[in-house]
Amino acid sequence: MAKIQAIRGTKDILPDEQLYWQFIHEKVASLLKYANYKEIKTPIFENSDLYDRGIGENTDIVNKEMYRFNDRSNRDITLRPEGTAGVVRAFIENRMDVQNRLQKLWYSGPMFRYERPQSGRQRQFHQLGIEFIGSSDARADAEIIHLAMNIFNDLSVNDLQLDINSIGKAEDRNHYQAKLQEYLEQYYDDLDTDSQNRLSSNPIRILDTKNKYTQTILNDSPRISDFLSLESEKHFDDVCDYLTLLNVPYKINTQLVRGLDYYNDTAFEIKILKSQGQDTLCGGGRYDSLIHQLGGNKTPAVGCAIGLERLLLVAKDNILLPHMSIDCYIVSKGIKARKIGIIITQFLRNQLVKTELDISSSNFGKQLKQAHKKRAIACLILGDNEIQQETITIKWMYTQEQENMSIIEFKNKISYLKKKIAFNKKFNSY
């Protein structure tokens, strides 16, 4: 019988690793709360039409990477490959623009793409997204970029480079694509296979190529900056000015495009310069047409997404987790002691004291070893003597000091116990 294992491209996040994920989530939630962004959760699968129309039928994501299938009702379903389209669908369906035209939202969760697994890239991966819906003001673009940079700074992720570009409006891109296609057709035989396939359907996507030789051909290609309308030029200049005011350094990269068709005007990526694997941590831009394209009212928006696996790779060494310890570990021996132990366990938990009850039936020596292994601050001992006298023994694990008191007194002195636990936590390095 074949051994059952996790599917290639997926990864278990075990408890010790989950602590880092939780740390990042709490850090991000706190930062975004003070910017008045509210968390939203959308389903992990949607009608495939959402991504066909939203992301674009000529993109690699739709053509090659989506987990797409028919369910038992023969509906065309896709596991979400990114988060923005689902947020936009929720915005339209729930008429969130009626509640408040300006919606500042964020999300975090698993996404799915059929890609070659490598460091920082899995087939099930996690993204954090930030979306500012309802404003075409350049300050919204600057705010999204600044928030992303603040997240990295709060996690002590340094050596970052912000690449930014304007890809203009649809009309600007149509003029540009025609000139780009005309230029690249001269070199058709020299282009890599993917770029040859893109040349007729979506030539602007060739700018995203990783093929070194194709990149050299692109060095002398037309620049989209020469095709921007005055409105797009002004918007881009304003974004750059606001970033300067916010002390956010940036590099204008005229060949930067994003892998999703819904972007217009601002497009950006944040990269780490010392990365061993994938170096792009964050990407985003403006998507003023997407909401209308998916059936909503004309509503401008801007957002970004951060790859959490990649972020964790570069941030983990900078995260100092608090010592994970148990406030009280209860050991007991005998039927009566076990009954009292389970009652005291629930009493302490109700008092917000982190408590674990040893249910191993081992001797006291082995139970105390477990208390030590789990870094317990206090060990509560219930043995034959304690049961006969209706008392409890408290052993403070760091100092080895012991106290004995009646069970009634113990319950009445819960405030004393909590203060002493807090004091002993400062020295819990055994």
Swiss-Prot record:
Give the organism, scientific name: Porphyra purpurea (Red seaweed)
**Aminoacyl-tRNA synthetase among keywords:** yes
Keywords, alphabetical: Aminoacyl-tRNA synthetase, ATP-binding, Chloroplast, Ligase, Nucleotide-binding, Plastid, Protein biosynthesis
Question: So which domain of life are we looking at?
Answer: Eukaryota
Which InterPro entries is this protein grouped with?
aa-tRNA-synth_II (IPR006195), aa-tRNA-synth_II/BPL/LPL (IPR045864), Anticodon-bd (IPR004154), Anticodon-bd_dom_sf (IPR036621), His-tRNA-ligase (IPR015807), HisRS-like_core (IPR041715), HisRS/HisZ (IPR004516), HisRS_anticodon (IPR033656)
Which residues pair up as cystines? none
Per the record, the gene is: hisS
- Quote the SUPFAM superfamilies the UniProt record gives: Class II aaRS ABD-related, Class II aaRS and biotin synthetases
List GO terms (cellular component aspect): chloroplast
What is the catalytic activity of this protein?
tRNA(His) + L-histidine + ATP = L-histidyl-tRNA(His) + AMP + diphosphate + H(+)
- Annotated family: Belongs to the class-II aminoacyl-tRNA synthetase family.
GO molecular function terms attached to this record: ATP binding; histidine-tRNA ligase activity
Q: What is this protein called?
A: Histidine--tRNA ligase, chloroplastic
GO biological process terms on file: histidyl-tRNA aminoacylation
As recorded in UniProt, its EC number(s) are 6.1.1.21
Instruction: Quote the subcellular location field of this record.
Output: Plastid, Chloroplast
What is the phylogenetic placement of the source species in the record? Answer: Eukaryota, Rhodophyta, Bangiophyceae, Bangiales, Bangiaceae
